[in-house]
């Protein structure tokens, strides 16, 4: 009788065993009978009159309280339905704790390889991890985080329903739009241009996403030194971590066949600030370059030749932006520490990508190949035409490919020809049908209010032919390797977390880069992702349960929490007994 679990007709779960927790929830979403004060009631095991039998359950069923019960509001909402589905999914995968039936096991499922292969490779088809995934293993409760990782689709849907998550995304987007308005302008132009010309942009989604990220990163980092306001946002970066020893890879080989044991770690940097190294004032147009009639290549050559001087007076600060629901920084130190580590990874990646331009070139190509992309395949001509029409620096730069000229990047120039062709001749037809003039977005000068200019397709007629050097991802990897070499050499050892409440940057934390701390964290995170250790739940103290578990989706079904809370109650009773006995002596 003591090991049985009884459920009344209303779905309320009753455990007729010692220390029944009367404010818990079972895995299937039903509730254990709650009390007013959330106390744990001791059912004395040596007194059978204290054990509920079938007659007792029947009396409980007929209490007036149950006549007015109804499903909780949570289960009547989309969020509640997703939560129930997620809990069921996690329970099915992890199984019940055999020592504590009805509660989820807190060890990795047997029969599976490890979280990296289970989640990233097999479930999501992504042969990579993210900086966020490495940093969130220990920022709160590792147990909760891996329950979420294994139910990623449902967890993400739940997150997207939360107001604060949506608010945070909007703040990030508004900051990006303020610094880089050309992105929305480009999207608007492209939409109208395709509709008017009846052109289609048939391009693989993964290729399109990577191409946009690479193009925008080059453009934004170049602008950091030219007409920019000293800021760049949403910049991609990556590095590698060894699958066997969990160490961050400091030196890359040029061939992917020699780096199979290295897993890509990708990230997106929220904010880069170019500032004077001595007075910390933000630098605008630090390179003093006139971009008219210039190209990406010319600007990069100039920056490379003046890098020593730039480095003596300037530095770039990496920041991570965190949004808050109240104007206060987190009270949990592990959350702040996780944010610090996130920026340390970015600093490490930029340092790694600034060692050698040839290695960095191959590193970006390995990144693309691991995503299943063909780095030798010509890029969709319509996509390139929209870049040419909206970005003069790019248009002037790719003339080198059009005419088969070198771009002054030795690895690319020796590697670029290939057997594929890149042909834009079909666009000659546009000159004989439909409109040929369009308003395109331009970068605004301080003394000009014009945001667009009129361009004619006829002015770009020289591009509408077969190019002598195909335009592939290799070209973008080459330009990325140059600008990342420049930026990486300027990255400061001072890192920053920016806290925002609504659109107000109410607090910043500046801290130093710590190589040893980063290496230790990377190894520990890698061990759990690659199967070297099990999950580490939070330390079982009542304070931790009150702090970490209060809003956790798994708080009613977590065996770790349930078992240890019972132990704490037992301990409390024992201490009370000892104190009582001591006082009676």
From Swiss-Prot:
Binds 1 [4Fe-4S] cluster. PANTHER family: EXONUCLEASE V (PTHR14464:SF4). [4Fe-4S] cluster binds at residues 141, 549, 552, 558. Single strand DNA specific 5' exonuclease involved in mitochondrial DNA replication and recombination. Releases dinucleotides as main products of catalysis. Has the capacity to slide across 5'double-stranded DNA or 5'RNA sequences and resumes cutting two nucleotides downstream of the double-stranded-to-single-stranded junction or RNA-to-DNA junction, respectively. Its main location: mitochondrion. Its EC number is 3.1.-.-. Its cofactor is Mg(2+); [4Fe-4S] cluster. Residues 1-26 form a transit peptide. InterPro entries: Exo5 (IPR016610), EXOV (IPR019190). Belongs to the EXO5 family. It is found in: Mitochondrion. The keyword Transferase does not apply. It comes from Saccharomyces cerevisiae (strain Lalvin EC1118 / Prise de mousse) (Baker's yeast). The keyword 4Fe-4S applies. GO terms for biological process: interstrand cross-link repair; mitochondrial genome maintenance. Monomer. This is Exonuclease V, mitochondrial.
